[in-house]
Amino acid sequence: MLPLLIICLLPAIEGKNCLRCWPELSALIDYDLQILWVTPGPPTELSQNRDHLEEETAKFFTQVHQAIKTLRDDKTVLLEEIYTHKNLFTERLNKISDGLKEKDIQSTLKVTSCADCRTHFLSCNDPTFCPARNRRTSLWAVSLSSALLLAIAGDVSFTGKGRRRQ
């Protein structure tokens, strides 16, 4: 914590300090201090995701319990009923998981430039943020160009230019 406070108090190189562009700094420091002082409670978003999982699990076990109560005597029907509830539970979890993945894919990241405090919202499709996508495109273009050049070179040697000299 002491190094963070020293960084905050010392001026940055060339008189520009990135921390002046960071309005959420006090909230983040407060959260870090809560973690250091072992104050209970996870972040709200994590607890909401956990609540979703616990709620779906509770529904599943309640349905299984009801099936056991009603179909206790017929074990084959009971196993089929439990298997059906298991499949429904899995489908609901997969649906929630797909929704979270889609939300994450479409999300943007807020990036602040220290030089002028301008805020940029970047996504993974942005070449500034994920340059690996552009490399794949350039690799594809280089491969295609090489294949075309080899095809042209091969075509020249087989078309008869070499035969005319003989």
From Swiss-Prot:
Renumbered to this chain, the signal peptide range is 1-15
Q: Give the keywords, sorted.
A: Membrane, Signal, Transmembrane, Transmembrane helix
Query: Membrane topology per the record?
Result: Single-pass type I membrane protein
Transmembrane helix is among the record's keywords:
yes
The transmembrane residues are 138-154
Q: Where in the cell is it found?
A: Membrane
Gene Ontology CC terms, in alphabetical order = membrane
- This chain belongs to which protein, by name? Testis-expressed protein 51
Recorded source organism is: Homo sapiens (Human)
Q: Which gene encodes it?
A: TEX51
